[in-house]
């Protein structure tokens, strides 16, 4: 969705560079997950270091009040400080995903912003597009603001947008793979043809992947494994914060044209010795 405003007459101060998802506006374009950390302390420290404002939580795998006998993640990630984004990780059909979103809304006191993901199989965790479309329609009709994990197919992205999804979240590569952005061309097509925010979801492995996503014009990047599986998750969270910031600034600045041949940087006239 991002518009390149990289002109001298229309500067965009980065500190005012917000983006809107549904009815909410955010400053940080880095979204983070809560899984795979060694304990709650590390979870809180890494998320704090990331400066993320949106934190996604797998409702089927994380206790946010369902079980009073287990530690509650919300004691570490307070809804007063962060926007909690419930997700439907682990759902393989529309019905289960819909039910999970309704449970999240109940647990979070009417919260209606959700991340929909309906998976195709356990080996690839690739999105099941047909079930995703089915679930998205029901959830939108029920008043949810749906951010949707999907394939990098521009036509599917257009369909999800036309249904009313508030953000399109194509995968960069397989969930947890760390392979980076495999198909930048189709991601660019989605960005160019989508009016709602586009956020890369899945596949980011290191800071350069996040920067590239932002340089392409993505509105944000969501990640979990890249931070949680790093040797030093807190340091990696800081690196990702800076990478997303730098990539966004580079996009707004506008990169130089790519050329096949060399172009001298120094003047071609006025040499001291001729």
From Swiss-Prot:
A GO CC annotation given for this chain: cytoplasm
Annotated active site: 115
Location(s) in or outside the cell: Cytoplasm
Keyword Plastid: no
Pathway participation: Cofactor biosynthesis; thiamine diphosphate biosynthesis
Pfam families on file: ThiG (PF05690)
Main location: cytoplasm
Biological process, per Gene Ontology: thiamine diphosphate biosynthetic process
UniProt keyword annotations, A-Z: Cytoplasm, Schiff base, Thiamine biosynthesis, Transferase
Gene3D superfamilies: Aldolase class I
Any one GO molecular function term: thiazole synthase activity
EC number: 2.8.1.10
Keyword Cytoplasm: yes
Database matches in CDD domains: ThiG (cd04728)
EC top class, as a word: transferase
Binding site for 1-deoxy-D-xylulose 5-phosphate: 176, 202-203, 224-225
Catalytic activity: [ThiS sulfur-carrier protein]-C-terminal-Gly-aminoethanethioate + 2-iminoacetate + 1-deoxy-D-xylulose 5-phosphate = [ThiS sulfur-carrier protein]-C-terminal Gly-Gly + 2-[(2R,5Z)-2-carboxy-4-methylthiazol-5(2H)-ylidene]ethyl phosphate + 2 H2O + H(+)
Function: Catalyzes the rearrangement of 1-deoxy-D-xylulose 5-phosphate (DXP) to produce the thiazole phosphate moiety of thiamine. Sulfur is provided by the thiocarboxylate moiety of the carrier protein ThiS. In vitro, sulfur can be provided by H(2)S.
Subunit structure comment from the entry: Homotetramer. Forms heterodimers with either ThiH or ThiS.
HAMAP family: ThiG
Family membership: Belongs to the ThiG family.
Protein name: Thiazole synthase
Source species taxonomy: Bacteria, Pseudomonadati, Pseudomonadota, Gammaproteobacteria, Moraxellales
